[in-house]
């Protein structure tokens, strides 16, 4: 028998709609870093927790995203795998829109922020 998973999906700009997971139940999770809101659904019998990075109403600007609360909430819900989508721009003409990129460098401006 295949073990059922608890999967977290973090959607960025352009990936705010989780309707593919059927009927969704909103959840608010309390964390030491503040509240995180997500939607719970199912897919192929697995529990899916959809977290909209910019909020369910897309009202949170990038510099105000509470990343620590979001990740803590998924951990608290028992999520063991996370699939995260994001959309960014590029100044490199060799990377036209629609190019799939795996990053090897990261500038993290979220340190020491609650």
Residue ranges of predicted features:
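Metabolite-binding pocket within alpha/beta catalytic cores that recognizes anionic/polar moieties
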Residues: 2-114
């Amino acid at each position: 028998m295949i073990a059922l998973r608890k999967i977290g999906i973090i959607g960025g700009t352009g990936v705010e709609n989780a309707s593919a997971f059927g009927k969704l139940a909103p959840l608010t999770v309390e964390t030491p870093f503040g509240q995180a809101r997500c939607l719970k659904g199912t897919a192929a019998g697995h529990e899916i927790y959809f977290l909209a990075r910019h909020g369910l109403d897309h009202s949170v600007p990038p510099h105000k995203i509470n990343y620590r609360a979001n990740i803590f909430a998924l951990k608290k819900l028992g999520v063991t795998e996370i699939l995260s989508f994001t959309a960014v721009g590029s100044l490199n003409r060799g990377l036209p829109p629609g190019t799939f990129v795996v990053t090897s460098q990261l500038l993290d401006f979220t340190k020491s922020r609650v």
